[in-house]
Amino acid sequence: MTNIRKSHPLVKIINSSFIDLPAPSNISSWWNFGSLLGICLALQILTGLFLAMHYTSDTATAFNSVTHICRDVNYGWVLRYLHANGASMFFICLYLHVGRGLYYGSYMYTETWNIGVILLFAVMATAFMGYVLPWGQMSFWGATVITNLLSAIPYIGTNLVEWIWGGFSVDKATLTRFFAFHFLLPFIIAAMVMVHLLFLHETGSNNPTGIPANADMIPFHPYYTIKDILGLLLMITALLTLVLFFPDLLGDPDNYTPANPLNTPPHIKPEWYFLFAYAILRSIPNKLGGVLALVLSILILIIVPLLHTSKQRSMTFRPLSQCLFWLLXADLFTLTWIGGXPVEHPYIIIGQLASILYFSIIXILMPLTSLVXXHLXXX
């Protein structure tokens, strides 16, 4: 009799995805972030579901309902801060996961990569809408500023913004629809994750050398299940430290003031995980130009596979490309810092230079370096 694990139509899908899956024997901890992202998503959906049971998406009561969750609901404060800081862990894992893909050439699996980029956009949209829901000052003004960017689109811009708002300003209609979409999108994301994995399992995982490892594969379970659990424990430790000791470390104090359309906060800025994109947006003095740069800062990932000029897949044996990669990372930290600083003399020019550098590294310097290295190798 065959094992139910291999014969049952449903169980055999799980088996071929998480148990008997052949995996390269040399993948490092940088390959842990996929499973961590899956767990982050599950955590966000669960905590979000329980928060939604007590939340009201009406401008008159939204802020108070969040206060009520924190004060009166059993362990409501844990749910709320797990959900808020879980988003931060989600984005840390997301950015490290993308960085891993860039470094080791995983983007050569184009279908998997492109679905990953779409997933990134979807998660960013979800996080943005979620930030609006508590209806604090930053929620309201963040929603106003970011939705207003669409008015830069020629001809249809203004109509588009008013259509999204459901009126002539960010109001009840906007909050209600943002809640609806914030609830819906994670399930769409979960479905897309399945497709992401489907395409990944067509090719199998990449590995740190960038050389096909078909000759040396090991079963996913127990080797990588136990390795993933270690990564999970580390992430949960970090998350719980954040939630139980520093729950408001990454938040904005302005969001503890109820939304007031008549009073603009001194510095409007998004959550930390959007600051790099916000800095790129602000570094261009033209509205439409800024919006385009903002979208392209993420969309540029789509064309990365086309810009691969090296003979080798991974950067493991390419010191020049490695230098550029870490310069890119430092540049992203710089942009994140600038995004949170006010629009004043030293910061403006730093932000502009960092933005130029960001696009130059990805689109010009990296392909050129790979070409040069290929010629050096040939010689």
UniProtKB/Swiss-Prot annotation:
Cofactor: heme b
Membrane topology field: Multi-pass membrane protein
Compartments where found: Mitochondrion inner membrane
Keywords, comma-separated and alphabetical: Electron transport, Heme, Iron, Membrane, Metal-binding, Mitochondrion, Mitochondrion inner membrane, Respiratory chain, Transmembrane, Transmembrane helix, Transport, Ubiquinone
Annotated binding of heme b b566, by residue: H97, H196
Transmembrane stretches, start-end: 33-53, 77-98, 113-133, 178-198, 226-246, 288-308, 320-340, 347-367
Residues at which a ubiquinone binds: H201
Kinase recorded as keyword: no
UniProt superkingdom: Eukaryota
GO molecular function list: metal ion binding; ubiquinol-cytochrome-c reductase activity
PROSITE patterns tied to this protein: CYTB_CTER, CYTB_NTER
Cofactor note: Binds 2 heme b groups non-covalently.
Other facts noted in the record for this chain: Heme 1 (or BL or b562) is low-potential and absorbs at about 562 nm, and heme 2 (or BH or b566) is high-potential and absorbs at about 566 nm.
Function: Component of the ubiquinol-cytochrome c reductase complex (complex III or cytochrome b-c1 complex) that is part of the mitochondrial respiratory chain. The b-c1 complex mediates electron transfer from ubiquinol to cytochrome c. Contributes to the generation of a proton gradient across the mitochondrial membrane that is then used for ATP synthesis.
The protein's name: Cytochrome b
Provenance organism: Myotis oxyotus
